[in-house]
Structure formats: structure tokens, C-alpha cells
A protein has these predicted regions:
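Extracellular/secretory pathway-exposed regions associated with glycan biology
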Residues: 3-93, 97-187, 191-203
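Secreted, periplasmic, or luminal enzymes acting at the cell surface/secretory milieu
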Residues: 2-41, 45, 221, 230-352, ...
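Short acidic, flexible loop segments centered on an aromatic residue
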Residues: 96-102, 107-108, 348-362
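Surface-exposed amphipathic alpha-helices with a cationic face
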Residues: 215-223
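Aromatic- and glycine-enriched glycan-recognition loops and surfaces
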Residues: 1, 204-216
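Extracellular/periplasmic catalytic domains that process cell-envelope and extracellular macromolecules
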Residues: 130, 168-172, 219, 241-242, ...
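Extracytoplasmic/secreted envelope proteins and their assembly/folding machinery
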Residues: 162, 169, 212-215, 258-262
Length: 362
């Protein structure tokens, strides 16, 4: 039997972490927040469902997932309420990330107001909290169309202690680090302005530094490190490529992606994917982003050494190729020839291979 222990290592880009105090909130005698949902955008009338959340909010309608049972996946609104009593005095950071509109009120006073639609926002507010004093927290949200996302937590922000994180997994037989990028960082126009990311565009292709440093700390434990890299585009990760025991590029694998990744890591499925784009070693390998010429871009014109070339991919089996033959066709159809390539699985595990053929004019 295999025991899997989960630990959040770091955020995508930020080198600080939140020491959550969500459990210092309560509603109706329960830890956490009371949640009321309406099947309209305006919180009008009686709520159609009332429930409670005991953990920091991390809600989405991706994959037609509802925020709570019976709640619509579009055109709805919600109010989350809780009373927060800090155990110590000091600065407490409230972090809200949402799509579409949201607003945060503390003791009835709006401190975050992003009551708009059609864009993603990531906002923080810092409260100078007093020990033992109660604060009434209200978070309101509405979904207009498209994606519905809402994340909320509160607590002290502290620098990430890489060695501490690594020490907590140092006795594992293997360490699986799932990182990379997120659709909340790259994509269409969005309110993101972080190192390497601007408004949905990427200003650098490197793996965010916080993840690179954490991978190095994990590798220093001496345990095997597998990097599961999620992204929607190429990522430069030369250290990981050279030092991790394995890198599994998952892109954004969808609702059943976790099961598929587990099957590959457990050896129940022989991976056969191939890269549909070139992975470069550095942003400096590429021309200026605003230079639209194709010189020194893509597998066709890149003049340097790629980190991983277009079409690259490994599996658990070795495949051998026989002599290829080309048979011209004379039937006048669209095809002019047939290419035959004998392929043999020389490994011990059943698997698929992707035969790649490239044609160019001379």
C-alpha cells in the first residue's frame, strides 16, 4: 500500500505564505463561515441554499462544478459571513481572488470593492488586528457569465521557509512536486501584474523563481524528486530539467487529470505524449516579444539548442525502428505516396509510440 501525504509548498509566484487564521472565524457556533446562495446576481430575496465552510474558500465552476450542492453554475450570487477573533495583535492580510464581482466588508465597512464583471481580480487588504476583539467579516460575490472563481483566506503573511518545507517531506520515499503555471496567470486579458506576468501575457518564460528554489531545497533532501509541470505554454526550467529525477509535463489536464497523472506516476499507464511546442532554455533565447518575424522561433527556425525540442517525449518502453519505405501512388488521388515504418516495442511494458515524419521542400 502507498500512503500519499499532501503539503502545500508555495504559491505560484509569491515568496510569502499565509499562516491561515480562517479557523479563528465562526458563524452560528461553527468554525469558519456561513454561506448563503441566491439564484440571481443581486442577492435578492430569500437564499435558495445556506451552508457552512470550515476551510479557506477555493471555489470554481470549472467542469460544471457548483460552489455548493444545488447552486447554479452561472448567474448566481453568494454572501459569506463569519466573526473573526484574532489570538494575537498584529497585521492580518485578507486575500480575495475572484471572477466575477466581489466585495469584502469588515464591521460593515467596505475594504475591498471589485463589484464588476468579466475579469479576474486578485486583491489584498491588511488589517491592524487587536487581540481578542471580534470583527464581523462579510464577503459578497456574484457570477455574471463564463468562469466563476472565488478564493478567500486571511492570516499573517510570512516569508517562505524553504528548508522548513523540505524538512517536512525529508522522510518520504519520493517527493512529487506539482507546480508550473495557472490559467489565472496566463490567458486572455486579466488583472494580473506579477514578475513574469502582465495582464494575461507572459513577460518571461522561466519557471517562477519561488518554485525553482523550492525544487532545489527538495532535491537537497536526497530523496527522488518528480516535477509535475502544469502550464498552457512553454516553460524554461533548465535546473529542473537537469536535476529532477523526472519531469512530467501535464499542461492543463482537465477534470480527470489527477487520475491520469496518478496512473502514469504509479506505472499503470505508459506515457506516450509528445511536446506540441518547443521548450526553450531561457527568455533570452528568443527575439523581442513585439518582433513578429519568425526568425529564431519555433522548431522550424530556432537556431539555438532547445531545452526540449518540438516532438520530444519519453515513456517506460524503448521502441526500435526498422527501415522506412516509401511507395508512390499513381491513382491520381490527394495522397501521392505511402510511408511505412516498422516499429517494435523493445521494452517490458505495453505502450504506444508516436512516429514523427517531417517533409521539406528542396
Amino acid at each position: 500500500e502507498t500512503e500519499v501525504v499532501y503539503l502545500k509548498g508555495c504559491d505560484y509566484v509569491d515568496e510569502t505564505v499565509t499562516l491561515s487564521e480562517f479557523d479563528k472565524m465562526s458563524a452560528d457556533g461553527r468554525k469558519g463561515m456561513k454561506a448563503s446562495f441566491w439564484n440571481n446576481r443581486t442577492l435578492d430575496g430569500d437564499p435558495m441554499r445556506v451552508t457552512y465552510f470550515g476551510e479557506p474558500l477555493n471555489l470554481t465552476n470549472n467542469g460544471e462544478t457548483a460552489f455548493a450542492p444545488d447552486v447554479p453554475v452561472v448567474n448566481f450570487s453568494a454572501r459569506f459571513e463569519g466573526r473573526y477573533v484574532p489570538a494575537e495583535s498584529g497585521e492580518v492580510t485578507f486575500h480575495v481572488e475572484g471572477d466575477d464581482g466581489f466585495r469584502l466588508l469588515i464591521d460593515g465597512k467596505p475594504v475591498i470593492d471589485e463589484w464588476g464583471e468579466g475579469h479576474k481580480s486578485d486583491i489584498t487588504y491588511v488589517l491592524d488586528a487587536k487581540k481578542g476583539r471580534g470583527y464581523d467579516i462579510v464577503l459578497e460575490y456574484y457570477q455574471a457569465y463564463g468562469s466563476a472563481d472565488l478564493k478567500f483566506d486571511l492570516g499573517e503573511r510570512v516569508p517562505l521557509d524553504y528548508k522548513s518545507v523540505a524538512s517536512q517531506v525529508a522522510d518520504a520515499d519520493a517527493i512529487i512536486f506539482v507546480g508550473g503555471l495557472s490559467p489565472h496567470l496566463e490567458g486572455e486579458e486579466m488583472g494580473v501584474h506579477l514578475d513574469g506576468f502582465r495582464g494575461g501575457d507572459r513577460t518571461a518564460i522561466e519557471l517562477p523563481a519561488v518554485q525553482d528554489r523550492l525544487l532545489q531545497a527538495l532535491k537537497a533532501t536526497g530523496r527522488p524528486v518528480v516535477f509535475v509541470m502544469c502550464s498552457g505554454s512553454a516553460v524554461a526550467m533548465p535546473w529542473a530539467a537537469e536535476n529532477c529525477d523526472a519531469v512530467l509535463t501535464a499542461f492543463y489536464p482537465g477534470e480527470a487529470g489527477g487520475t491520469a497523472i496518478a496512473d502514469v506516476l504509479a506505472g499503470d499507464c505508459n506515457p506516450s505524449g509528445r511536446l506540441p511546442v518547443t521548450f526553450y532554455a531561457s527568455t533570452s533565447d528568443l527575439p523581442d516579444f513585439e518582433d513578429y518575424y519568425m526568425d529564431n522561433r519555433t522548431y522550424r527556425y530556432f537556431e539555438g539548442k532547445p531545452l526540449f525540442p518540438f516532438g520530444h517525449g519519453l515513456g517506460y518502453s524503448e521502441f526500435s525502428y526498422g527501415d522506412a519505405t516509401i511507395k508512390p501512388l499513381a491513382d491520381g488521388g490527394e495522397a501521392v505516396a505511402v510511408l511505412n515504418v516498422p516499429v517494435t516495442n523493445a521494452g517490458q511494458m505495453a505502450g504506444d509510440d508516436v512516429v514523427q515524419g517531417y517533409v521539406r521542400n528542396r
